[in-house]
From Swiss-Prot:
Species: Citrobacter koseri (strain ATCC BAA-895 / CDC 4225-83 / SGSC4696)
Purpose: Removes the pyruvyl group from chorismate, with concomitant aromatization of the ring, to provide 4-hydroxybenzoate (4HB) for the ubiquinone pathway.
Family, per entry: Belongs to the UbiC family.
Binding site residues for substrate: 35, 77, 115, 156
GO BP term (any one): ubiquinone biosynthetic process
Subcellular location: Cytoplasm
Subunit details: Monomer.
Name listed for the protein in its UniProt record: Chorismate pyruvate-lyase
Gene name as annotated: ubiC
Any Pfam family the entry gives: Chor_lyase
Length: 165
């Protein structure tokens, strides 16, 4: 059974262009650096609650597949990023199987390590785009990232306790 925050994350609807929003809100939504690091800058101890890690078929990641290479399997990781034990962010990472070679194979073994701790230590990380999304009162974003030119999708939903609000 899926966590309610993941249901909300999948319900995000994305803006075609960056909306006119308060600068503080945009600062969070368009952050290029690690969200883990940003939460730690708020003086919090960051931890991961792992909800799901598994290979899945394209039908389970249909929205992300539209922005990734078509493959038969994708590595799916769904988490809650918590600050002092309180969920601040729901995250969903979709990685094409072809991305999981060489150093990027480590993406399968993150366990309770925040994704940002891995991604933002890589000198090969690039970001193709950030799209801002909203579902009811909650804000989120998604990005296509590349490690050594190999793509993955990261979707993040800011939960009500997050300092974004």
């Amino acid at each position: 059974m899926s966590h309610p925050a993941l249901t909300q994350l999948r319900a995000l609807r994305y803006f075609k262009e960056i909306p006119a929003l308060d600068s503080r809100l945009l600062d969070w939504l368009l952050l290029e650096d690690s969200m883990t690091k940003r939460f730690e800058q708020e003086g919090k101890r960051v931890s991961v609650t792992l909800l799901r890690e598994a290979f899945v078929g394209p039908h389970e990641v249909a929205e992300e597949v539209a922005l990734l290479p078509v493959e038969s399997r994708y590595w799916l990781r769904e988490i809650l990023l918590c600050a002092d034990g309180e969920p601040w962010l729901a995250g969903r990472t979709v990685v094409p199987e072809s991305t999981l070679c060489g150093p990027e194979l480590a993406l399968q073994n993150l366990g309770k390590t925040p994704l940002g701790r891995y991604l933002f230590t890589s000198s090969t990380l690039t970001r193709d785009f950030i799209e801002i999304g909203r579902d009811a009162a909650l804000w989120g974003r998604r990005s296509r990232l590349r490690l050594s030119g190999k793509p993955l999708m990261l979707t993040e939903l800011f939960l009500p306790a997050s300092p974004l609000y």
